[in-house]
């Protein structure tokens, strides 16, 4: 009954909008673009989104939206009440940038050295700010909208808390209690003006692992006096990749192991004492994730021991699997199709990306969808996320505002 009443509320909420909403959205497109450019020019890392959160809070306050600052470090929560009491729907965007030096020579290129919005969070914020403006000017709906601007989606710095987990811990889904939550992620490789969705598991879980390989240091000219941690590390890297290719049933669900950092040694003629590895595990099945974690430990320790060395493995779970509620998706598809057009709402495959948005979905129903950000008329290829060349087309954001508003 709870879910049924929530669904009925959605239809009341959508039905209340006048036909002029679409015109209003078109009228603020340049505003949305300018917000995105501003955020892109002034990116801030996880748990350091000070300027970013202030810009957002001031915008929401200017709309007459009740604002709470510093939720989960720098998170912003805005509450907009409709004409009557009713259910509470949350809309979420993430705010943090990445430690990447931008190579896009744009008028709004990052001015913060070594920091870049390379995953589209600048557009997520701009889209949700646009939706907040439209909804604040059209309060003839029943219920309440809670705008959640969250920091540290990419993960808080070592030794700090942050992200969705901390916002939930600090009560972002309460006072008033949220009945359902919706969010989007723009994707640079997908054609713009299209929306992509998947019921059940959509984005993968994410785990971070570190492996310290300890050997015996020696002169590069006398390797027989060493236990070479670089050789051990090479064997560990190759063997760990066989966990996916030879031990995982990929017809069941996809899984990925990637190494992001290998660090060891400080001089060409010294065999170092240790090498450190850092990597990520992605899986859409918790049983598979647990098996991969177990095998990483077994292989690392076993290989190191066989060479006379030692491996110390630490694995920390990050985001859970992003589980989209199938019933809510089915009931919301008419709204998506109304916003984007029937042919532009596309059933997607599962992705081995990860999103801490999953933690909200562990608490309440909702879903995350993808928004295409690539202009197929572009002469250059669509860039990968988390790279210095990442970009999205500004005009792709308009559909995002439309969907989040509807």
Regions found by a protein language model. Name each.
Residues 62, 231-406:
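Metal-dependent amide/peptide-bond hydrolase catalytic core
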Residues 1-20:
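Bacterial Sec-dependent N-terminal signal peptides
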